[in-house]
Amino acid sequence: EYYHIILKINGIYERKYNRVYHSHYLTGTPLSAIAWHFSKNDLEVQLIHSESNYFTNHNNFLSDKLFELTLEEYKEYVKDANRVGAVISKGVDITIDLLKEKLNDHYFILLAGQVHSCLHTILICEYENNFFAVCDPLYREIQSKSDKEINEFMHTSIGKWCLLVREKSH
């Protein structure tokens, strides 16, 4: 029952957050906006990036101008999230082991990734029997993803990043 609720909420909230916090430059909602939302709603939040300046555009994933505009928009939400208590980290080696460790610490993980040429985010709920339990707003069922699948997903053209969320009681 728990997972059926998570799936439904995942899709509902994705649409809600996209309406409220949508990017002015890319399709979807910046994770920094979600970090701000969760932080101001009294959840413990960590926003982690592999790159020293949040993202890189060395692969020319976006035009230079679009990258600059998108990065500035992202940074504005980062400031807001940090102001209300989110912990923001840059230059972190985001690995499968780190994800497993954070799941063991009772965090839910919103993991950014890339599917073909599109950036996308999934919710990782747990790690059990050598698989990650993944809620993807594009599907209506819990998916089991291997370490390899998650590792491939999270390596994007602009870096790796994730949002960790849990109740403050931990």
Question: Across the structure, where does each feature detected by a protein language model lie?
Answer:
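Noncatalytic regulatory segments and standalone regulatory/sensor domains
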Residues: E101-F108, A112-H170
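Short His-Asn-centered micro-motif
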Residues: G28, H49, G91-V92, L111-Q114, ...
